[in-house]
Amino acid sequence: MKSDLPVISLIGTGHATSHFLQLVLPPLFPLMREELGVSYATLGLILTLFYVLSAVLQPLAGFVVDRIGGRAVLLGGVSLMLLGTLLMGLSQGVWSLALGAALSGIGNSVFHPADFAILNGRVTRERLAHAFSIHSVSGSVGFAIAPIFSAGIGAWMGWHAALIAAAAVAGAVLLLLATNAGRFAVEAHPAAKKAGGFDVSVLLSWQVVACFLFFALHAAALTGILSFGVSALKEQLGIATTLASTAITAYMVGSGIGMLAGGFLTARTSRIDLVPAAGLSASACIMLALATGVVPALALPAAFALSGFAVGLTYPSRDLLVRAATPPGATGRVYGFVYAGLDVGSFATPVFYGWLLDHGTANGVFYAVFGFALLAVFTVLQLPARKPAIQRT
């Protein structure tokens, strides 16, 4: 345990930082719009640039991780996000903002392939479920801190200061990781060293494709809840924004608790495919109840909290399922490819959900979430059911 804890803590800190830096920019949009005289659409395009580069380059980062190991790639990713955030903080116009966002997006692309290569390579099998659980929770913590941090400093000292302060946080984390880099060094697998070029054949196996589809469908459902849940609840039930927002917050809190509990559950079961199947099925049933309108308004926070808890349970097991589908020497590229599915699901569905709301079918948002969740259950049941044997990256 002593050798595992520093690795899990360091990688979790890096993951929290990546999520923190992803979300420091949007709360500053009103201040940036006023000072720079640009539209929200323009600022939205800058944010889109970040996520597109992150999604497209994530599989490529996985290939690099497999070839040289995760340590150098992770440190490089943190460095790029630091530089990108600092450049945005110093920028005086849209083009420098876009360049900073691009650098940050490139840096963000490395975290999932590098993190999971390191965790799989350094953490003992018995503690992997807990390691994946903490990894997921750390990302949520980064998301939770970012809006408070950037909005608070932005209101006090301006958006430039907020971004420069965020870059300083990244600098402190980079220093922490660099001075402890020996703790998470992982040698590239011999199979990856022997492979020439960028062999994508491993990504075309049905198991890996099923993992990608599972992540994409899960993200599609999550987008409906987090991005359109408040609007859908208001339109469908005519409730106040505060109650609708409280319900979504309850979902996130329940999800975080579920992630921690999921680590213990996954560590104690051999049929790891049943955990995400059961969790998503339970969440889907709650979404169906919401769509049909049988849940009273005052019970919405409790219903969303239960749904979030059920989904949170699935996070550690889904990462172990990806591990089970990964051949030796391909950890980086498989995790990079599969996690790109989250970005695809997030990009592909907002217009659809918006169309449902525009056409007066607010409950259709929850019917759609229900459908995406059931499709995700189908894909996860196609994956290896047993815990993977120990393999090194």
Labelled PLM ranges:
Residues 23, 51-59, 143-144, 252-256, ...:
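Residue-level signature of mid-helix packing/kink "hotspots" within the transmembrane helices
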Residues 26, 207-252:
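Extracytoplasmic gate region of multi-pass secondary transporters
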Residues 56-92:
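Conserved MFS/SLC helix-loop-helix module at the cytosolic interface between two early adjacent transmembrane helices
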Residues 57-69, 259-271, 357:
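Helix-to-loop junctions at the C-terminal end of transmembrane segments
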Residues 100-138:
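Cytoplasmic helix-loop-helix junction between adjacent transmembrane helices
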Residues 135-182:
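Helix-loop-helix hairpin linking two adjacent transmembrane segments in secondary transporters
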Residues 184-211:
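Juxtamembrane intracellular "pre-TM" segments in multi-pass secondary transporters
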Residues 273-318:
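C-terminal transmembrane helical hairpin of 12-TM major facilitator-type secondary transporters
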